Amino acid sequence: MFATSIAGSLPKPAWLAETHKLWPQWKAEGDALLQAKADATLLWIKAQEDAGLDIVCDGEQARQHFVHGFLEQVEGIDFQNKVTMGIRNNRYDAMVPQVVAPLRLKGRVHAFEAQLARAHTKKKLKFTLPGPMPIVDRVADRFYGDKVKMPFPFAELFYQEAPALEAGGGDIIQFDVPAFHVSIQDASERG
């Protein structure tokens, strides 16, 4: 028998964030935002349980964007001076943060989501992390100078966060590479 789960994120409620935008803005700040993220997460956990899914997730409700939600907790990323860059193999342009220094985690990236979700479900719990390929596709490199080498420091950060998610109650860690099909050549060059 196959275990059932969703793939990817779930839509954010209109009361949490703008809808139908690549990088939606939050509709609250401070403690009110934390509570809104928690409320949205709990609603989606309940919906997945009610649907009978075997494995539930946080729906990525606390992340503005699946890549940038990770990068917000990484030292060496400049969000203040975004630049325009072609992403998804130059399919479209986006304003992206820049890598400007060696990369280090500021602390746990998704501890809030892991603790909240684990406390509210007895089902198996899955967390999604972006893979290195989608990250390097969505940041401008102003430090490493080599797109082939740049994924490796990000991979080291995942080796820190993934076991921490597991220790925090995550049963499954999914590395998500949604635009792999537009980066086949990059994948073969980078391994």
Residue ranges: model-predicted function:
Residues 1-191:
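Domain-level signal for soluble alpha/beta catalytic cores
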